[in-house]
C-alpha cells in the first residue's frame, strides 16, 4: 500500500521519528476501528497535545467522518488516488462509456478518461472536505503531486479552494504564516 511505502521511506530518513517527537501518531489500518478514532480525539481534546492521523483515500476515515475544528487543521494528500484500471467494474464502466461515445459521438459528453479522473477527484474532494466543516473552520490543504500544476487537475478541485491555491517552494513559511494568521483571529 502506498501509505505504508511513504511511512517506511520517512522512517528510513528519520522524518517519521521527528514527527513522533512533536505529535502522537495514529495510522489507519484496514481493520481500523472506532477505538483508533477515539484515541485520536482524546489526544487532541483531553491531552491537548495535537496528533497526526495517517489515512488512505477511500478508507473509512477519509470519507465518512468529520474532522472539524482542532480535529483537522491540515489535510496532506500525496499522489493522486486513481482507481485500479484492472478492476472489473471500472473496466466495464469505461467500456460502456466508450461504446456510448462511439454510438452518439459529440452528443455523448462523457469520455472514459474523464470518468476515470472523476473517480479520483471524488476521493480527493471527500478527503479535503473532512476538515473544513463550517464557515469559521480552517485547515491547511497540501496537494503534493506535480500533476496539480496542470489545469485539467486543478479544475477538479472545488472553486472555493482553487482561489486559494498556491504553488510554493517555501511551503514551511507559508504554513507558519497561515497558522499565525488564524491564531491572531481568535484573540
Region locations from a protein language model:
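ASCE RecA-like P-loop NTPase motor cores
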Residues: 1-187
Amino acid at each position: 500500500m502506498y501509505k505504508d511505502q511513504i511511512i517506511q521511506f520517512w522512517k528510513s530518513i528519520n522524518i517519521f521519528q521527528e514527527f513522533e517527537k512533536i505529535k502522537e501518531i495514529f495510522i489507519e489500518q484496514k481493520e481500523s476501528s472506532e477505538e483508533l478514532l477515539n484515541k485520536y480525539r482524546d489526544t487532541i481534546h483531553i491531552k491537548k497535545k495535537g496528533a497526526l492521523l495517517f489515512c488512505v483515500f477511500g478508507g473509512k476515515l477519509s470519507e465518512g467522518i468529520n474532522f472539524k475544528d482542532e480535529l483537522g487543521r491540515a489535510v496532506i494528500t500525496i499522489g493522486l488516488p486513481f482507481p485500479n484500471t484492472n478492476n472489473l467494474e471500472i473496466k466495464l464502466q469505461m467500456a460502456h462509456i466508450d461504446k456510448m461515445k462511439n454510438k452518439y459521438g459529440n452528443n455523448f459528453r462523457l469520455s472514459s478518461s474523464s470518468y476515470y479522473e472523476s473517480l479520483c477527484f471524488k476521493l480527493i474532494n471527500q478527503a479535503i472536505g473532512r476538515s473544513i466543516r463550517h464557515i469559521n473552520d480552517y485547515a491547511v490543504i497540501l496537494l503534493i503531486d506535480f500533476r496539480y500544476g496542470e489545469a485539467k487537475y486543478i479544475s477538479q478541485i472545488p472553486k472555493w479552494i482553487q482561489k486559494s491555491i498556491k504553488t510554493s517552494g517555501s511551503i514551511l513559511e507559508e504554513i507558519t504564516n497561515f497558522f499565525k494568521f488564524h491564531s491572531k483571529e481568535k484573540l
